[in-house]
Amino acid sequence: MRPPWYPLHTPSLASPLLFLLLSLLGGGARAEGREDPQLLVRVRGGQLRGIRLKAPGGPVSAFLGIPFAEPPVGSRRFMPPEPKRPWSGILDATTFQNVCYQYVDTLYPGFEGTEMWNPNRELSEDCLYLNVWTPYPRPTSPTPVLIWIYGGGFYSGASSLDVYDGRFLAQVEGTVLVSMNYRVGTFGFLALPGSREAPGNVGLLDQRLALQWVQENIAAFGGDPMSVTLFGESAGAASVGMHILSLPSRSLFHRAVLQSGTPNGPWATVSAGEARRRATLLARLVGCPPGGAGGNDTELISCLRTRPAQDLVDHEWHVLPQESIFRFSFVPVVDGDFLSDTPDALINTGDFQDLQVLVGVVKDEGSYFLVYGVPGFSKDNESLISRAQFLAGVRIGVPQASDLAAEAVVLHYTDWLHPEDPAHLRDAMSAVVGDHNVVCPVAQLAGRLAAQGARVYAYIFEHRASTLTWPLWMGVPHGYEIEFIFGLPLDPSLNYTVEERIFAQRLMQYWTNFARTGDPNDPRDSKSPRWPPYTTAAQQYVSLNLKPLEVRRGLRAQTCAFWNRFLPKLLSATDTLDEAERQWKAEFHRWSSYMVHWKNQFDHYSKQERCSDL
């Protein structure tokens, strides 16, 4: 997904040949030896020099790698960010800076479907930089601002990825676009709640500091600090939701877009106790003393600060409590500070009268995750699984489920006319993971926000890109609407179809209309189908594909009633069972499985008998 005219592809930007190339492309920061005033901006920290970039419709200005915090290294590891001190002279902001230290996906080396999400700059703990794209020349009147927060399970991600290129939205829609790096994994979310040395949620605090920077400085770029929209996908969307729920963040933005993620998802937060368990286990794994009641938190964190960054990353995944997918080791913690209560409680009691929110999902939210640990799944075959593999997959996909709850999931998702059909079992496994982690939390959030006064719009994205390299059985996977929202199909070198280019332009208009007015519809367009608000009564949402908008009702309503209403009650009930009753139910479960096995064997025997009679 890297256009050949992309002038910031590699860190080696100092070569004379590259500067010559940039000059030929019209991308240099200077013209005939003079500074281009459009590329010089003064912010509170000092002066910046940006770069002019080409986009298919004309040039844009980009200011890349702007420091907004002091490097969180040494004694600042695990600590809240500190604002960047002023600098002297003109700071070069013509190239992306380091990516925050993180896990790198090596499951399919060289495969574009995984490599596109891997870091494309040097890994470093010195990584708190942000980027600004504006139309060229800069807007003369205040322009709405879009702030992107990347996803990656809170363990990975970078604002410099090619799929997050802000030039298209800036050039085509005339907006100001901002993205930032924030700390992930151990460095952003390791927590010993109550301690000063590692309070937790510092990755979210990185994001908040970037939002504060935007409020203080974006007017210098032509942006309107009074019209700021947050948008993010997956963990980025969950982050957006947490800023909605965190009072100190609420004054820093005005609208929010949550793509395929929510703060109330089962993977998005952990309790203070679980966060401490994971932190102390990581410490033990890397040879540091325990903290808490059995030790000293200060000693534990002091020791962890001496460990190489890669050593911490290498041990991150070993702290999860059970085998699972769509669960991540270090995530936001309910700390009583950034999150004063659980997301569910804050959503239920919040006042959202002044909020406009756009939320949605893609068609096949679960498929991407199956190749990362569910038995029988691979990108290199059709992943036609057996019933035994499906049953094992349910335990991995819903790791918190009791035996009875897992049986309920199996019951709900089995096609009882064809209970052994491999293709159905594959698709059912994808639906289990997607519904549980994304679709039904999104539906729940949309309903609760709408009930409490927010203006909500909802969608399902259904188009599979013609350039997608993942296998057909994956459908429209998690994350693959992003390239259309950012307008990548407008670049002819990327080989999208004409229809996809038109589709991308339509989506860009919906998102920027929402950023301007809180409504994705164009007030000047009376002919196109209207996108209605989502209400608790009508539950209307739209399908986004190559066809005109289609309005539907009830986003997987029956299935989400199972996840959002029935299953929590079942889990609560089974939590109160005494041990004898638990054992009885476990025996009953084994007996049921035995009877199913006996019936299958009997049916097989009966068929053989009939065949022998012929």
Swiss-Prot record:
The active site is at residues 234, 365, 478. Keywords: Cell membrane, Disulfide bond, Glycoprotein, GPI-anchor, Hydrolase, Lipoprotein, Membrane, Neurotransmitter degradation, Secreted, Serine esterase, Signal, Synapse. InterPro entries: AB_hydrolase_fold, AChE-related_enzymes, AChE_tetra, CarbesteraseB, Carboxylesterase_B_AS, Carboxylesterase_B_CS, Cholinesterase. Its main location: other. It is found in: Synapse; Secreted; Cell membrane. GO terms for cellular component: axon; basement membrane; cell surface; dendrite; endoplasmic reticulum lumen; extracellular region; extracellular space; Golgi apparatus. Has been found in central nervous system and muscle. Found in embryonic liver and spleen but not in adult liver. Its EC number is 3.1.1.7. Disulfide bonds join 100-127, 288-303, 440-560. The keyword NADP does not apply. GO terms for molecular function: acetylcholine binding; acetylcholinesterase activity; cholinesterase activity; collagen binding; hydrolase activity; identical protein binding; laminin binding; protein homodimerization activity. Residues 1-31 form the signal peptide. Glycans are attached at residues 296, 381, 495. It is a peripheral membrane protein. One of its GO terms (biological process) is response to ethanol. The keyword Secreted applies. Belongs to the type-B carboxylesterase/lipase family. Terminates signal transduction at the neuromuscular junction by rapid hydrolysis of the acetylcholine released into the synaptic cleft. Homotetramer; composed of disulfide-linked homodimers. Catalytic forms H (GPI-anchor dimer) and T (asymmetric collagen-tailed), which differ in their C-terminus, account for all types of known ACHE forms. Interacts with PRIMA1. The interaction with PRIMA1 is required to anchor it to the basal lamina of cells and organize into tetramers. This is Acetylcholinesterase.
